[in-house]
Every structure is written in structure tokens, then in C-alpha cells.
Amino acid sequence: WIAQPVRTAFNHRHSFNLEGGDNTLRYKLYFGINQAPGVMKGTGVDTKSGSIDLRYRTNKLLVSNQLSIDFTVGDRTSPYGTFQTYTMLNPYYRIYDENGAISKVLDNHVYSTDGYVSYIGGYSTPTMNPMYNIQFHQKDQNKQFQVRNSFRAEYTPIESLRISADITLTKTEEDLEQFKPSSHTDFEGLAVEDRGSYNWTHNKGT
């Protein structure tokens, strides 16, 4: 069971740089992609970044400006559930039923004697199959978009005097979206109208 929700994950990082100019004006362009899948299936972080860096220099004046943009998408929760759930399952439980479909219930923990129903081992609820939920669309995703602009100016009227000014502006937007369908095993035993969940949160910052 513990091998089912995990995978071998490799981090992929790619970048592109272009720079040039002369003694007066210099420029630098950057674009990068960082894909970091998680060990749990269906999790990971995907980041795309870009920046433009400009520098202008004369005898007494230096002006620079850097604009950077970052966009990150993170899938926080595996559709397989938590790893701890799998460590608690008995190895003899069968993932699939006799028809090859993923079983919803692994063990009811009940037996009947003379018309009376008893629970085995103190269990009062059935053990659900966490892999049953991978058949349905679900989401626990975080998206973040950030723009940052840094401006700096330096003026040196004489060799022993330097005047400088810095301005940095940052804008961030973040979305968190969480969805579980009504067929998810988390809602087993609940009334139909209480099944399923959806949550969306949007944050802005400067």
C-alpha cells in the first residue's frame, strides 16, 4: 500500500540569459522555469520567472532599473490522500474488486450472529479505500503572481560626495482553490446536501 501514492520525483530547472550593451547602456534579460514535482503523486510546484535589467551610466550619473515577474502554481494535496493513511492499512486489503474496479470500502469491520450486528476490533465506521478518490476531479491549488520593480539612481557631483535614491514597488496576487466532489470518501455517511466542498480565497498585496 505505501508504494501506491508515491513516485520518484526529479526537479527540472531551465533558464535563458541574454545580456549586452556598451559602457553607457547595459541590458540583461532572464527567463527561467523551475518544475519541482512532489514525492506524493499529483503534488508539486511549477515556477516561471522573468526579468529585465537596464543600467545607464555617464561620468557622474548611474541609473538602473530591474523589473521581475514570478508566477508560481503549487498543487498542495495529492488526490491519493495522505501518506499516513496508507501506512495504517492492512497489507491484505485489496485495491480492486473482482471486476477490476477500485473498491470503495476495504473493510466494514462488522459481522452478524443470530441477527445481531457487531463491530470488530472496536471499529464503528468502515475503512475506506483512499485510492477510490483518484477517479474524481479534485483540487487543492495555490497560485501566486508577483511583479517587482526596483529603481536606483546615483549621482556623484564630486569624488567625495555620492547622492543615491532607491525605490522598490511590489505587487502580489494569490489565489487558493480547494474542491472535493460529493463522491469523495470524506463525505461518506453524510446527507446528500452536505456532501462536497469548494473554497476560493483571493489575496492582494503591495
For each predicted feature, which ranges?
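Short alpha-helical segments and helix-capping/turn motifs at coil-helix boundaries
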Residues: 11-14, 47-51, 147-152, 156
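Surface-exposed loop/interface segments of Gram-negative outer-membrane beta-barrel transport/assembly proteins
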Residues: 1, 39-40, 49-146, 164-206
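Generic marker of residues within folded, mature protein domains
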Residues: 6-8, 19, 42-44, 55, ...
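Outer-membrane beta-barrel channels and translocator barrels
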Residues: 11, 22-23, 57-61, 156-158
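Transmembrane beta-barrel domains of outer membrane proteins
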Residues: 17-21, 30, 53-57, 66, ...
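An active-site-proximal structural segment forming one wall of the substrate-binding cleft
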Residues: 161
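Short strand-turn segments of transmembrane beta-barrel domains in outer membranes
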Residues: 1-17, 27-43
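Acidic/polar, low-complexity linker and loop regions
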Residues: 25-27, 127-128
